[in-house]
A protein has these predicted regions:
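Loop/helix-junction capping segments adjacent to catalytic residues or to phosphate/diphosphate-binding pockets
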Residues: 11, 32, 165
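Conserved redox-cofactor binding core of oxidoreductases
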Residues: 121-202
Length: 202
């Protein structure tokens, strides 16, 4: 239920705290996975999401992301970027159940391992890629099965694209002919290269 005022917010908070062990804010991939794990642990959970159910066909059709408006997309802009000659950067962020995963064409690519390792070098203890990888694996149910970089029994289904576009295949083939390394797993040991990414679909 959306919270429309601070007074209403206080009422909902008091009621929720009386009825639930835990309140999770945000119904995106992270919040939904956290809520699911807590329920498995026997907790009663209230999952709060500012947006709606995301039943629109625009949300359910991966190629429609450019047409998503404010009801399902916060449509953030960055501050002017020096490296972009003062331009701002568009940052789509999902509003509704599924969060940004509902409007990202179901693409499943983790952050680059170098970034995580760099965060730890900057003082963020516990954020090295080797530290966070077990959590990625625990969340993932990859149809390729579990292994060094993938989980096989988590709540988030990850699979190869069922119907990859022929243009995408042609692009990969053209890049390979130019000696650009083909990468069949962007969430594996090596993240650079060209290839078809996996998606969050069954």
């Amino acid at each position: 239920t959306p919270l429309y005022s601070s007074a209403a917010s206080d009422v909902y908070k008091r009621q929720a705290m009386d009825q639930f062990d835990v309140i999770v804010v945000g119904g995106g991939s992270g919040g939904s996975a956290v809520a699911g794990r807590l329920v498995q642990d026997g907790k009663s959970v209230c999952l709060l999401e500012a947006g709606g159910r995301n039943n629109s066909m625009l949300v359910k059709t991966p190629g429609m992301m450019p047409f998503l408006r404010g009801a399902v997309n916060y449509r953030y802009e960055t501050v002017p970027q020096k490296g972009l000659n003062g331009r701002t950067g568009y940052q789509p962020r999902g509003k509704g159940l599924g969060g940004s995963s509902a409007i990202n064409a179901m693409i499943y690519i983790r952050g680059n391992s170098w970034d995580y390792d760099n965060w730890e070098q900057l003082g963020c203890t516990g954020w090295a890629y080797d530290d966070v990888l077990p959590y990625f694996k625990r969340a993932e149910h990859n149809v390729r099965g579990g292994g060094d970089y993938h989980g096989g029994d988590g709540p988030l289904w990850v699979s190869d694209q069922h119907w990859p576009n022929q243009t995408s295949r042609d692009f990969v083939e053209a890049a390979a002919s130019l000696q650009i390394p083909v990468n069949r797993d962007f969430n594996g040991e090596r993240q650079a290269g060209v290839g078809l990414y996996q998606v969050t679909q069954r």
